[in-house]
A protein has these predicted regions:
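N-terminal export/assembly segments and adjacent metallocofactor-ligating motifs
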Residues: 2-8, 17-210
Length: 210
């Protein structure tokens, strides 16, 4: 079965964005499969890369039609943006009304990119493959839900956000703010010290005072 899946997937792992962090590559390596014995179909070859989305990229040349992105969009986010169109060798992932990804009704939660086993759908921050110094478990501060996040740190700055699947609060899911709006963490206008109003003016205070 894995060999058949690989007939429709480029065997160019070394140049792939998610090299060494690809579920398909991991399964193939575990089974000792580095090539396939079948003629390669052409249903996913030569499809233009869709870079119209602000946060995600769609590269259907690397899609294996597993359908996980469709289920994540439907069952986790409830947006129903992605679907499997066509039949047989003509099957492929499309957005609503076959629009460009950036023109679709996508709410940018990133669930599709997070669950994709290859880099058919990935985000612009390369959250699945970024070379980082460390990863730190934290809690999103945008709202009161308290989604558990994993921040990828490089040179003391957050460069990507992941959502661990085993977390109880959000079970590996979050919204656009939690996943992609992390630039505010280092924004110069962000309040990092408690303020107390004294004599009509806000003054910095200690955490104990606050």
């Amino acid at each position: 079965i894995v060999e058949l899946v690989l007939t429709d997937h480029p065997m160019e792992c070394d140049s792939c964005e998610v090299n060494n962090n690809c579920e398909l590559q991991t399964v193939a390596n575990d089974l000792g499969i580095s090539d396939h014995r079948y003629n390669s179909p052409k249903q996913h070859k030569g499809i233009p890369r869709d870079t119209s989305h602000d946060y995600m990229r769609m590269n259907l040349d690397n899609c294996i039609n597993c359908g996980r992105c469709v289920r994540a969009c439907d069952e986790i986010q409830g947006s129903f943006v992605l679907t499997m169109s066509g039949r047989g060798f003509e099957s492929k992932i499309t957005t609503d009304n076959d629009m460009m990804f950036g023109d679709s009704s996508c709410v940018s939660c990133g669930a599709c990119a997070h669950t994709c086993p290859t880099d058919a759908i990935s985000d612009v921050f390369q959250s699945k493959s970024a070379a980082v110094d460390k990863k730190v478990r934290t809690t999103c501060s945008y709202c009161g839900v308290g989604c558990n996040l994993e921040a990828s740190i490089k040179d003391d700055k957050v460069v990507a956000i992941d959502t661990p699947k085993e977390t109880e609060v959000n079970a590996g899911h979050t919204c656009i703010k939690g996943r992609y709006a992390f630039s505010f963490y280092d924004h110069p206008d962000r309040l990092k010290t408690p303020l107390i109003k004294r004599n009509g003016k806000f003054e910095e205070a200690s955490w104990d005072e606050a």
